[in-house]
Structures are given as structure tokens and as C-alpha cells.
Amino acid sequence: MGLEMAGFRHLLLVEYEKDYCESLKRNRPEWDVRCMDVRVFDGKPYRGMVDLLAGGVPCPPFSVAGKQLGPEDERDLFPQMLRLVEEIDPRIVMIENVRGFLGKQFDAYRSSIIARLNKLGYNVHLRLLNASDYGVPQLRPRAIIIGVRTDIYDMFTFPQPHPEKTQTVGNALFDLMAANGWKGALRWRETANKIAPTLVGGSKKHGGPDLGPTRARNAWLEMGIDGRGIANDAPSADFEGVARLTPRMMARLQGFPDDWQFADRKTTACRMIGNAFPPPVAKEVGQKIKQVLDYASIDSRSTEDVPRRAFG
């Protein structure tokens, strides 16, 4: 969605989770969504057709919340991403992962990925971006890799942070918390005067959705949020106790518009939200990428209203 907001037209999307595919189709029926394992997807028919190849490589192999097996983890899809880069030969590549990917224990692996992109003909930019610097009311640090093909003038720069524009959790969610007339909403807004910890959507192995392990839950509790579960609805008028977030509240903290529809099952919806790359961050990075593509085209054609083609 963030890349769409930046001016890209999606040529194709590949997604493994069936419920996630259905959500994408429900919101954007015109998108070509392929619900399949990327390991069996053939990118060669799209060679030369793609301006931007973008993807979020699964984070568990690099997350500090896991065993950090990196390339030894069967869920590591960096090799598949590099295969698609070679097959499709996009003008620009964008890869997103968790902060753990930048850990010292992955220095050699990270260097090998950059070297592979260099060999495939790309200049590489790597930076850690915090979602809270781009209007998203949660910390959510993410490692971003940008590869610009060497036949394109590389004027890419990462977007400048503007944390002063980011709301607190209380201000961001006040209307949703007060939707059912909760009398404690104003007092709660004053308590929730910080930026949220990184949102998670719960583990497939450990039951329903929640807001993460004990440390994260404690941080939520300081803002008047019970992180042990997710509510179906906002607090009632006479509710007493510690409020819980709803899936819609989680989505807003992640930067989704309020009209974006998720899976019907709460657990699935929360996992989809928690696994997402915040659209406002993707938009800002996408705008910087589009500037490079537009500049590369300026000598050959007008760039006005040219839809850039993204593949993800």
C-alpha cells in the first residue's frame, strides 16, 4: 500500500498466506495477487518489465525474539530474493527486514548479500529506519536495503526523519478508544503519552494474539494498555480497568488507513498487522526511489503521470 501511495502501480504480488491474499484482493481487487510459495515462483517472464522489485524477507531467522539461525534457518528467503533479482533484473530493488539482521553475528552473511547484489549490477544502500521518525506512533526499527542498477544514475538517498510529526499513542487512538462513550478515555489519553513499542501479532505456536513478551507488555501497561490479549471492541461507557487494543487500533498504530479491511478472524488479522511494513514508511522510501526512476527517464520522455511498475 505504501508503494501505491508513492505512485507505483503493482504489476504482481506474491504472498504465501491464504488469508493475507484474500485481504489484499478484498481491498484491491484489481491487483494481481498470486497466493503461492515464492520458492516456486518463476520471475523470468517478467524480465525487463519491472521498475521496482520490493519484498519483506521473513524476519524470524534474524529476530532477537528467536534463535537467530540466519542462513541456517529454513525460513530464510534471502536466496530466493536474490534469485528473483537475477531473473527479473529490476531497475531498483528494495528489501526490508528486522533490526537483528544488522547484528554482528550476521556481518559475513550480510556482506555476502551485498556482494551478490553488486555482482548482479547494483549499487547498494543499507540503513536502519525507525517508523516513529516517519509519522508512525511506534518504534519499529527496520533494516532497509536498496539496490540501484548501475546503468541508472544513483541519486538515491534515504528519507530524512521528522519525528516531530509523530503522535503519541493516546492522541493517535483517542477517538477509537472513546467510540463507545468510555468515560475514562480522556484520562487514558493523558497516560498514553508515549510512542508504542514494536507491534507484534502473536505467534502461530502460542495461541491467540497479544502484544508480545513480558517486557513489551510492561511497556504497554505503562500507557494504560493490557497487552495480554486483543479486544473485539473499544471499552464500554462504564468500563473500569485496563483497556486492550482492538485490531483496528493496532492497524492505525501500524499506519494503515481506517478503511483497510483485514481477515475476518481476529487472530489472523492481528498477525497480518503485526507482520506488516508500515505503509507511511514504505511511502517515504518509495517516493525517494521514484525520484531516481523519474530522473533516469527525464532525457527520454516526460515523467508526468508515468505509473512506475512495482513487483512484490
Kindly give the residue locations of the regions a language model identified.
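Conserved SAM-binding strand-loop segment of SAM-dependent methyltransferases
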Residues: E30-D37
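Conserved acidic E/D residue at the C-terminus of a beta-strand in Rossmann-like folds
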Residues: V14-E17, E96-N97
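C-terminal target-recognition/interaction regions appended to catalytic cores
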Residues: M177-G312
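Short alpha-helix immediately C-terminal to the canonical SAM-binding loop
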Residues: K18-E22
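Short beta-strand element of Class I
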Residues: H10-L12
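Conserved SAM-binding loop of SAM-dependent methyltransferases across substrates and taxa
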Residues: M1-A6
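Class I S-adenosyl-L-methionine-dependent methyltransferase catalytic core
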Residues: K25, V38-V40
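Class I S-adenosyl-L-methionine
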Residues: F41-L52, V57-L221, D299
